[in-house]
Amino acid sequence: MSDMFPHNPLRFDARGLSASDQVKLYRQLLLPRLIEEKMMSQLRQGKISKWFSGMGQEAISVGVAAAMPEDQFIFPMHRNLGIFTTRNVPLDRLFAQFQGKDYGFTKGRDRSFHFGSREHRIVGIISPLGPQLGLADGVALAEKLDGTGGCSFVFTGDGGASEGDFHEAVNVAAVWQLPVIIGIENNAWGLSTPSEQQFRCAHFTDK
């Protein structure tokens, strides 16, 4: 399994970031981690029924949400809590959603997925993940036709990249030259399916 990931050291380049910027980013990284720890604790206590953890992946969500203009749409996955916290979605509504309460975005029926916030330009998560890419293409097409200069950002995983929707959306985006960014988070699992059962190459990037 370790061979799936190239062993390149991470390097952080802080040039262009003030001390206050770095503190702000750190706090934005810390918040979803603290929420994750709380929800994992509640899961073990039986206070919630399900939780898709994104621990260790916070920097991806926070970095994207911090870099994207707030008026442009993001299509997150079920492990992208940092998108919601960085875009300042009210925490009381988030916790209500996670805990199955009426005040949640879908009255809590969908727990940590299938909900979004138009106000915060976050599109509700689609379970199979692949179909999200086509929707992001559509938003990008609207941005292009309207001449806004904006773009959309859509997340998928290594498992989602095995779906036919992924290849169709990538092809359409390329042919129509759409302003869409596709971010693939590779955690080596498509839910319970390991990478070696998804593709036959040494590294995911070869795919």
Where are these regions (language model features)?
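Conserved acidic/glycine
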Residues: 1-60, 67-68
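A short, structure-level motif marking secondary-structure boundaries and short turns
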Residues: 10-11, 23-24, 153-155, 189-191
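Cofactor-binding active-site loop characterized by glycine-rich and histidine/acidic residues
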Residues: 37, 41, 46-176, 193-206
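Short, ordered loop/turn segments at secondary-structure junctions
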Residues: 79, 185-188
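Short, proline-centered helix/strand-breaking motifs
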Residues: 179-182
